[in-house]
Swiss-Prot record:
Residues 115-216 are extracellular. The gene is SLC1A7. Pfam families: SDF. It is found in: Photoreceptor inner segment membrane; Synaptic cell membrane. Its main location: membrane. The keyword Transport applies. Gene3D superfamilies: Sodium:dicarboxylate symporter. Keywords: Cell membrane, Glycoprotein, Membrane, Symport, Synapse, Transmembrane, Transmembrane helix, Transport. It comes from Homo sapiens. This is Excitatory amino acid transporter 5. Residues 1-16 are cytoplasmic. Interacts with the PDZ domains of DLG4. Belongs to the dicarboxylate/amino acid:cation symporter (DAACS) (TC 2.A.23) family. SLC1A7 subfamily. It comes from the Eukaryota. Coiled coil: none annotated.
Length: 560
């Protein structure tokens, strides 16, 4: 009996957590397969063919980002009243800013203790000296992207200032131009039979200035779409019945996308194997990279572990008085997808699925908190930017005072908000942090070799922070949403047919006052005043035509 019980228990666990087990195995198999194939010396073309199943996984996830973000924000905010939505919005944004600032402090603390810059060696790379946009342009681009000029273009492009070098010609007369100085010197050979002359031109080079021009870059403008969808959802909620058709459309779109996710999720373990193995095949020599940037990588990973596995769960525990381990276990599938895809936006459909099905978070809260978090809550990115900035300062033997460290903490928090939920977006916003304290932006190339791997770990922390925020907001706002229970227009798949006897019983108990209100009865909690009422069968009415019937309900006559 005991072996049979154990076997039955094992089958039950596999049935309930089969997808999670497959995802864990796919990560392990992908790592082993990638390091094994490195010994085969595959060509770049062969590697691209090998990565094709993983590329399909990324395309499937990105395909669902736009409809999911738009439908969830618009339907979620439209279903809330103005007071509830404003309170939820203020609490969510304040929580995100606070946890992001805490992540920056953790990063500064870890990099100051480990001091990884002393073990790294600075090398001149081919990319040094390339023009990079200033911090002012980067901040202005964030604000511009919040208000896209073309919503259709915002679905596949975002605004980005382009910096081009321009040779500045001196505006002086030819006779006033600086003279051209040439220095000639000779080098005699060892036998003294021949003298080689060399000429050195000492004319000063022309002045080069960088000009900022408007431009675009490929990638969805997630910040602008989130801002527009949130505003549209709030306005639809205030329009009342006139906005109900569009709200119903958004609810149906959101539900259909989640059903697509439920089907596509079974392809993810297969795609993860090739996605991770392909990235390992593209990696440079691991020994050389580890020797140069090993301490830097350890610093970032330790900071992420401290913030993600200790600070955020403790914050969740103290606020909700619930076990964070149980909550995190419910979103393990989303964390594994974040590790594989390195994109918090691409992980958004899976995070929705885990919170609704495993952790039973209110659908209205998840619809608002998750899309906003995937856009502005970047705890892992903020920690990484703070560590990288101080690491570059240590490599250049640049001592940072207390004021500069405070500047780094503030700018890293602000810059991470604008980092779109796409792979390696932190490298772009890193410019803001470096220029704020006068560090050379060319040294970003020092950390590119390991950024692809660290990006996956910080994406996991970003997704974990979004999910825990949804759990905390569900606990804090539970009374507000308890008062609003029944006001949300649910989908047809979320309602049940109501019989005539139930309508009469509800009306006699005083739970509803009209037939129209009685038709809104759903699967929600029953009315506290409800008492089962025995409804007598009405006398058989004479047959009516198929196109007309009369229903009598408590002295109300309704023609249908």
């Amino acid at each position: 009996m005991v072996p049979h019980a154990i076997l039955a228990r094992g089958r039950d666990v596999c049935r309930r957590n089969g997808l999670l087990i497959l995802s864990v195995l796919s990560v392990i198999v992908g790592c082993l397969l990638g390091f094994f194939l490195r010994t085969r010396r595959l060509s770049p073309q062969e590697i691209s063919y090998f990565q094709f199943p993983g590329e399909l996984l990324m395309r499937m996830l990105k395909m669902m980002i736009l409809p999911l973000v738009v439908s969830s924000l618009m339907s979620g905010l439209a279903s809330l009243d103005a007071k509830t939505s404003s309170r939820l919005g203020v609490l969510t944004v304040a929580y995100y800013l606070w946890t992001t600032f805490m992540a920056v402090i953790v990063g500064i603390f870890m990099v100051s203790i480990i001091h990884p810059g002393s073990a790294a060696q600075k090398e001149t790379t081919e990319q040094s000296g390339k023009p990079i946009m200033s911090s002012a342009d980067a901040l202005l681009d964030l604000i511009r992207n919040m208000f896209p000029a073309n919503l259709v273009e915002a679905t596949f492009k975002q605004y980005r200032t382009k910096t081009t070098p321009v040779v500045k010609s001196p505006k002086v007369a030819p006779e006033e131009a600086p003279p051209r100085r040439i220095l000639i010197y000779g080098v005699q050979e060892e036998n003294g039979s021949h003298v080689q002359n060399f000429a050195l031109d000492l004319t000063p080079p022309p002045e080069v200035v960088y000009k900022s021009e408007p431009g675009t870059s490929d990638g969805m403008n997630v910040l602008g779409i989130v801002f527009f969808s949130a505003t549209m959802g709030i306005m639809l909620g205030r329009m009342g019945d006139s906005g109900a058709p569009l709200v119903s459309f958004c609810q149906c779109l959101n539900e259909s996308v989640m059903k697509i996710v439920a089907v596509a999720v079974w392809y993810f373990p297969f795609g993860i194997v090739f996605l991770i193995a392909g990235k390992i095949l593209e990696m440079d020599d691991p020994r050389a990279v580890g020797k140069k940037l090993g301490f830097y990588s350890v610093t970032v990973v330790c900071g992420l572990v401290l913030h993600g596995l200790f600070i955020l769960p403790l914050l969740y525990f103290f606020i909700t008085k619930k076990n964070p381990i149980v909550f995190i276990r419910g979103i393990l599938q989303a964390l594994l997808i974040a590790l594989a895809t390195s994109s918090s936006s691409a992980t958004l459909p899976i995070t929705f699925k885990c919170l609704l099905e495993n952790n039973h978070i209110d659908r209205r809260i998840a619809r608002f908190v998750l899309p906003v978090g995937a856009t502005i809550n970047m705890d892992g990115t903020a920690l990484y930017e703070a560590v990288a900035a101080i690491f570059i300062a240590q490599v250049n033997n640049y001592e940072l005072d207390f004021g500069q460290i405070i500047t780094i903490s503030i700018t890293a928090t602000a810059a991470s908000i604008g980092a779109a939920g796409i792979p390696q977006a932190g490298l772009v916003t890193m410019v803001i942090v470096l220029t704020s304290v006068g560090l050379p932006t060319d040294d970003i190339t020092l950390i590119i070799a390991v950024d692809w791997a660290l990006d996956r770990f910080r994406t996991m922390i970003n997704v974990l922070g979004d999910a825990l925020a949804a759990g905390i907001m569900a606990h804090i706002c539970r009374k507000d949403f308890a008062r609003d229970t029944g006001t949300e227009k649910l989908l047809p798949c979320e309602t049940k047919p109501v019989s005539l006897q139930e309508i009469v019983a509800a009306q006699q108990n005083g739970c509803v006052k009209s037939v129209a209100e009685a038709s809104e009865l759903t699967l929600g909690p029953t009315c506290p005043h409800h008492v089962p009422v025995q409804v007598e069968q009405d006398e058989e009415l004479p047959a009516a035509s198929l196109n007309h019937c009369t229903i009598q309900i408590s002295e109300l006559e309704t023609n249908v």
